[in-house]
Amino acid sequence: MPYKKQKAIRSNNNKCHLRPNDRFGFNIVNMKTRQSIFLFLMLLSTVAGAQTLTRRAYPTPKVTPEVRHIRSMMKSIRVDASGVTLPLAVDNSKNKFFPPVINQDGGSCAQASSIGYVFTYEINRLLDRNASASADNRFAYKFSWNMLNDGEDQGGFAEQGFYLAQRYGMMTESDYGNSGLYQFRWATGYDKYLRAMHYRVKEILEFNAADIATLKRWLYDAADGSATGGLLTFSSQSSGWTINDHYDGPSKTGYHSLLTQLATTGAHAMTIVGYDDLVEFNDPDGKMHKGAFIVCNSWGTFSHDKGRFYLPYWFFTDHQHTDLSLSSQMQAVRVTTYEPKAVFKIKIKYNSRNDLSFGTAFRTDGNTTSTPQYSYAQAFFNAGGDHPMQGQYLGNEIEIAIDASNGVTAASADGDMFFLAVKKAAIGKTVGDGTVEAVSLVDFRGAEPVEYKCVSSALPTAVKPGVTAFYVQPSDNRKSNYTVSASPYKYVENGTVSSRTFGIRTADGKTKKMKFGNMSPDGQSLDIRYE
């Protein structure tokens, strides 16, 4: 359980009472001891600055079928760097696209690297934005981490975050906001998720970590002649490594932390932001090697040299190290922006979110009787653990957006039908229950977005095992609104809108079918659908 902030309690003796605090681990209660503890912490800080900083060691994540699938689709990159004269050093962490150094929470290193650093940098490079200027220009690594960690403090792989950004999108820090480590929070708000959809990975790239020439070319100009280069993410063990924080040898970039020995335990993902060919390193046999990558860690600016250290090329080319101690592959991305054609706006109340997944389908034939072929969203897919929709200790109700653009025609037509599946499966230790509170479809194909309510089902609707289906036919919503008077007993049963289909006779003697839905809480308005 996370620590909760508590009020300080006065003490009548000389003992120092400590109370849990969810940020630092304790509150100092006794005023008489504060000065001495402050001096102790200052001394501890000074000592830590001259030593290797350590964190909790997380085990290597399991390579799941999904991870293998993602890796099978990554594009391998190898370029000929002979035709380009590379500078002696490149440091992409110094340009405006790179965000401030991250101090990660828990086992989120892979998402801090892939989303917090690499994706943020690449989107800003694409859009020519300053990452430090606004939280709108930085992407929330906890958004992806909490979609991928099964509601537990555990690690994952960088490519999982990239794939989520490719298939769904990525939320900004501004929209995501703050989140405690053990909340595993999902944001709520249709607009936030809609904005996340716009920022996408175009392709996930894979590099041979021993191909130093290709890696340097990517860091220099993204292997395509760009004015600035890209970033790389990689993994290594980090518990027990040796880093010399007083390196004073040759360099062009001026950092003073140099990794001299790999770790033996603890999986950790980090980001390569540049290189320096002048750095010198002596291997265990005393042989000197030139050149090192510049690594930016996610342990705050107080780690290493302002969060950065040199990692000699030699460790990647020595071939004596396993993939556990140092990865033989690195990843990068090319990014793009995306405009959805149609998006479902969903409000749902549910108490065990990993039961759920959300699928969409599109038809133009008006067929509502046969089951459509659903395409399921990458986000929210049996994810987030046995927690309420917003997270542990948070609310059951959430408003989200699901892209419904797959297969949608460029122009709208009267026969268009958009289908939504809310699929419930028994995942985890707890099978939840809840209701779909509201469903609508926002169509972006015209000059302005138009929102169409779901009138095919009475809402709220209980989420049942299997698929709870909804559909929206925009033509149903394009009728004029009329104020009508009718006796409630005709369409209300036991205090709720009847789900029955009524037959009505029109002025010209024809018979039409009519259904009611979405009655307001005060009973003064409702939707009428007829055909």
Name what the model sees in each region:
Residues 3, 24-26, 38-40:
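Aromatic (phenylalanine/tyrosine) cluster motif
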Residues 29-37:
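Bacterial N-terminal signal peptides that target proteins for export
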Residues 51-92, 343, 446, 461-465, ...:
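N-terminal zymogen propeptides
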Residues 484-531:
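Surface-exposed, beta-sheet-biased, low-hydrophobicity segments with strongly acidic/polar composition
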Residues 73-170:
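Substrate-binding/charge-relay-adjacent region of secreted/lumenal peptidase catalytic domains
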Residues 54-57, 105, 111, 115-119, ...:
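Predominantly the structural core of cysteine protease catalytic domains
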Residues 42-49:
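Hydrophobic h-region of N-terminal signal peptides that target proteins for export
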